[in-house]
A protein has these predicted regions:
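Residues immediately C-terminal
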Residues: 111, 301-302, 308-309
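Walker B catalytic acidic pair
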Residues: 298, 304-305, 316
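Peripheral, non-AAA+ core regions of ATP-driven protein-machinery
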Residues: 1-216, 220-226, 329, 467-468, ...
Length: 511
């Protein structure tokens, strides 16, 4: 007696088809499972046997062999419980094989036969549907998540008896839920109109959002660094449908997708504490789950108290900041997760927080140097905009002048993004911050006057090639925000202002 059932295993945010084969033959009574399995998958044998017994199914006293194919792919997770149980029931003749034909199953089994939810249902249903599979049997608690895929026929079950009961095509829920709908900005984001003063910082944030430039704020406690960072997502454009789907897949894998029959509409804002572990920040663990940098995909990763992060942890961001993804390896498995985020860093200017106010700062010169050395130069080199947040004055705190709202700023940022979208058609990048070095001259062209200005500033400030390129990219964004086709001297001058802090706090050139 032989049967096969289709399921899938996650590989990053994609799903790879897996065939669960069951053979029941004469021989010594034994239950074997093969197919490159992790311990949690091998444990399915006991869960399946007990669950079947709890619903009155007695396994035959024969040799039962379960194979999860292909064998070259590591099988991990608890979503194989249900497919294995159904494959056994089909081989025993309890379930009609035709009823699960062209169907993908996933779900974890309780010992009493209850079907428990599993993570990653959205990428499984999406990828399997695109491979031509139209029907899906998944846990009831994952039903809304499965219905996010337009056209997929989802059957949510809560108990093994639901599968054993005979059903046909009409038993499937055929509701087609389109993913596209009018997006609304998430009201949970605070508004920039609440921020008094700090006009220079707010302008820097607008430029950062306009070109998706990484930004660092350095300033004393109470300068409003965290308050400003929390408002950064409110000036970013809404997610595109592809961005929403990709982000929702990541949250589905982590079990964080809201069970409300909708994809994630808002850009994420992740704010991990500086005590975060390596696995929590970049991803990893036994199942190689996504980390904070992937949960911040297409959104903002806010790292407060940047200098307090554990030694070497920040340097792990160097590759993701360049490649916009993270490659993780563990126990023979290699997984890649998206990690295209806007890095927003914030830190005090010294250990006590009051440098360069020498009347209040208690730090010695060696202490200052050790403090800034906690943030390596390679990380600073990957941050386009570094600005100083000055303490708020009494007038700023008590100002009754109305401030510009996030909605007004977002309009300019969205127009800036539209210009870049049109400009970079056919390119591998979409934003000014991502312009490759070989395309800088094409997209950041300087006239003779502007080139002469930058030549003078290059020698005067001792710029490096890397810094020069960053200034050009930021200047391109400033020009876009101002509605200028070409980069002007004023745009270059403003871009240089967003790098001058490096000389003050890291010593040396504006690099």
């Amino acid at each position: 007696m032989y049967s096969t059932v289709r399921t899938a295993v996650l590989d990053g945010i994609s799903a790879i088809p897996v065939q669960v084969e069951v053979d029941i033959s004469t021989g010594m009574p034994v239950f074997d499972m093969v197919g490159n399995l992790t311990s949690e998958v091998r444990e399915a044998k006991e869960r399946v046997k007990t669950a079947l017994h709890s619903v009155g199914i007695i396994l035959p006293a024969k040799r039962i062999t379960v194979n999860l194919s292909p064998a070259n792919i590591k099988k991990t997770g608890t979503g194989f419980d249900l497919p294995i149980a159904v494959a056994i029931l089909t081989a025993m003749g309890v379930i009609d094989a035709d009823s699960i034909k062209d169907c993908t199953l996933a779900g974890e089994l309780n010992l009493n036969g209850e079907i428990l939810p599993v993570s990653g249902i959205l990428p499984i249903v999406f990828d399997e549907y695109n491979k031509g599979i139209g029907k899906f049997i998944i846990p009831k608690q994952n039903e809304n998540e499965g219905r996010l895929v337009c056209g997929a026929k989802i059957f949510g079950i809560s108990h093994l008896n639901d599968v054993i009961a005979q059903f046909d095509e009409t038993a499937f829920t055929c509701q087609k839920t389109g993913m596209a709908h009018e997006l609304q900005m998430d009201e949970k984001y605070a508004d920039f109109c609440d921020v008094n003063g700090q006009k220079f910082i707010k302008r820097a944030c607008e430029v950062a959002a306009g070109g998706m430039h990484n930004i660092l704020l350095v300033g004393p406690p109470g300068a409003g660094k965290t308050m400003i960072a929390e408002r950064m997502p409110s000036i970013l454009p809404p997610l595109s449908e592809n961005e929403r789907l990709e982000l929702s897949k990541i949250y589905s894998i982590c079990g964080l997708l809201d069970n409300d029959s909708s994809l994630r509409d808002s850009r994420p804002f992740r704010n991990p504490h500086y005590s975060v572990t390596q696995a929590a920040l970049i991803g990893g663990g036994t199942r190689i789950n996504p980390g904070e940098i992937s949960l911040a995909h297409n959104g903002v990763l806010f790292l407060d108290e940047l200098a307090e992060f554990k030694g070497g942890l920040l340097d792990l961001l160097r590759a993701p900041l360049e490649e916009h993804c993270i490659r993780l390896s563990r126990a023979g498995r290699n997984v890649t997760y998206p990690a295209n985020f806007l890095l927003f860093g914030a830190m005090n200017p010294c250990s006590c927080g009051y440098y360069p106010d020498m009347q209040r700062c208690r730090c010695s010169e060696p202490t200052l140097r050790r403090y800034f050395d906690k943030v390596s130069q390679p990380i600073i080199d990957r941050i386009d905009i570094c600005v100083e947040a000055s303490p708020l004055s009494f007038e700023d705190i008590n100002s009754t002048t109305s401030n510009e709202s996030s909605a007004d700023i977002r309009k300019r940022v969205m127009h800036c993004h539209e210009l870049q979208k049109e400009r970079f058609k056919g390119e591998s990048f979409s934003y000014n911050s991502k312009i490759s070095t070989d395309k800088l001259e094409k997209y950041c062209f300087l006239g003779s006057r502007e080139k002469s200005y930058m030549e003078n500033m290059f020698d005067k400030l001792g710029l490096t090639a890397r810094t020069y390129h960053k200034i050009l990219k930021v200047a391109r964004t400033i020009a876009d925000l101002d509605g200028c086709e070409n980069i002007k001297t004023k745009h270059l001058n403003e871009a240089i202002c967003y790098r001058s802090i490096n000389e003050k706090f890291w010593g040396g050139a504006v690099s």
